[in-house]
């Protein structure tokens, strides 16, 4: 069975902010032609859209293109929506409220499975969370990383998730990753990346790089040899094999669309076709 792996659609940067479904679908069609490839199934590792309406309509659209669509949430998907261009046509005052709405809407769409802390058909998924343990300099610390996240970073300013208690969020996703990986899915999806994907050199000394990654070795070691871990968040396309401490091999995939002024494939010379993968 062929899977196409993709993430970070940010489709509301490519389509107008609209409540007119026919208008949105015209832009979705062009977006699909430029960024997607045929396959039996599609895995989308988060950041479909900031806007809730665009998010749900994109799910409906993509469901018509593949036999199965698997999705996990991204950091942009779960932002609060309080007073946008459309006034208060639907408010989401907490990220939990928005997450629940997306799960309920996805459950209504045939062929779509939103895997937030869930597993289906041998595919597990969750958004994940950075663990604040990456140190970009010798003077960095978890405390300063968390302070920067809370006061300056997009997530800390636009989420209201567990009251933005970074410690609770880290514990939640550590528990989720352990439970999901222990079920040995053939594909693990997350939006945040295991550090085992590696970080391009130009980001290593950037304090904000900490907010993309977590240490994934304990979870990868739970997976079987030949498993796949798909992630997103960074807008650099990556495809590499990782060998864990137990000698098992895992394929790591990150295929972001990114923003209109970016070229995710440039860093490592990859292309869309590299992310169509045959999975037994």
Predicted regions located by residue number:
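Active-site-proximal loop/helix segment associated with metal-binding centers of metalloenzymes
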Residues: 124-207
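N-terminal active-site segment of His-dependent metallophosphoesterases
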Residues: 1-71, 77-86, 91
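Binuclear metal-dependent phosphoesterase catalytic core
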Residues: 18, 120, 209, 215-226, ...
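Short amphipathic alpha-helices and their capping/turn segments at secondary-structure boundaries
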Residues: 31-33, 57-63, 103-121, 172-184
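Active-site environment of divalent metal-dependent phosphoester hydrolases
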Residues: 10-16, 49-54, 76-86, 130-135, ...
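A basic- and aromatic-enriched beta-loop-alpha substructure that forms the phosphate/nucleotide-
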Residues: 68-139, 148
